């Protein structure tokens, strides 16, 4: 696909957490895709409206209207991914979130844009009651993504089709966001879906590794809880989000790559 403009809507996944930081911004899979698109088109422009922590209603209210202003036709690719943060909340209501998601997809598709959606990885190698609960929620969410994508003719990037993504080594230390290896794999999957140059070995699993010793595993669990889980719970208790006060990293069309 020869793309004239790439517009990204979403949350931390699309912002690029927790990839390498360049000029104060996470790189992420979307920047990597933009790199390849720019090589094929000197007039290519890029917009990334995604902000970490945003819920589906916030993405729809804040980002979709902005995206619509920048759509120029079929050669504009919009990626839309929202709702995973909702599903992580204790008060998650799928009867509210899923219709909101579907309506936003229909609204974007009606502009004539090329549209790409994403499923949520249902299993990331984590275990326990919380992991089981989230897997069930994400499964229902993904079924909705696939259904509305088929309805409007959107492209779907489905991580659950690739078993290697269950390897926790693609996750950052927070056990939630992708690390640089994970973002690179997502970028290659997106590029392949768009029939653009990609690494043909992107599906190759990581080599086997030794099991983490019991004591080190326990220390890692405590460090994770204190560093990530506890602050996350504290923000929820206060009604705060990691995205509060943040702005999109590229809120208007820019030539890419940045010189």
Predicted regions and their residues:
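Serine-esterase "nucleophile elbow" of acetyl-processing enzymes
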Residues: 1-52, 64-74
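Short glycine-enriched, charge-decorated loop/helix-capping segments at active-site entrances
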Residues: 19-24, 92-95, 130-135, 172-173
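Conserved catalytic region of serine esterases and O-acyltransferases that act on ester linkages
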Residues: 2, 151, 174-177, 181-259
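Residue-level recognition of beta-strand->loop/alpha-helix junctions
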Residues: 48-50, 119-120, 158-161
């Amino acid at each position: 696909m020869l793309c004239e403009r790439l517009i990204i809507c979403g949350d931390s996944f699309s912002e690029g957490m927790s990839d390498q930081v360049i000029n104060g911004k996470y790189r992420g899979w979307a920047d990597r895709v933009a790199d390849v698109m720019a090589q094929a088109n000197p007039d290519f422009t890029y917009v990334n409206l995604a902000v970490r922590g945003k819920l589906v209603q916030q993405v729809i209210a804040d980002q979709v209207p902005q995206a619509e202003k920048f759509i120029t036709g079929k050669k504009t690719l919009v990626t839309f991914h929202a709702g995973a943060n909702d599903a992580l909340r204790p008060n998650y209501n799928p009867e509210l979130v899923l219709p909101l998601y579907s309506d936003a997809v229909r609204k974007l598709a009606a502009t004539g844009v090329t549209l790409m959606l994403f499923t949520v990885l249902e299993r990331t190698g984590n275990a326990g009651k919380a992991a089981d609960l989230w897997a069930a929620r994400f499964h229902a969410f993904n079924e909705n993504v696939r259904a509305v994508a088929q309805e409007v003719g959107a492209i779907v990037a489905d991580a659950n089709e690739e078993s290697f993504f269950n390897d926790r080594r693609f996750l950052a230390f927070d056990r939630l966001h992708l690390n640089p290896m994970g973002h690179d794999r997502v970028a290659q999957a997106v590029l392949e879906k768009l029939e653009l140059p990609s690494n043909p070995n992107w599906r190759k699993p990581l080599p086997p590794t030794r099991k983490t010793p019991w004591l080190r595993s326990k220390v890692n669990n405590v460090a994770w809880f204190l560093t990530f889980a506890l602050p996350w719970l504290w923000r929820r208790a206060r009604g705060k989000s990691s995205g509060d006060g943040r702005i999109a990293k590229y809120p208007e069309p820019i030539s890419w790559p940045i010189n």
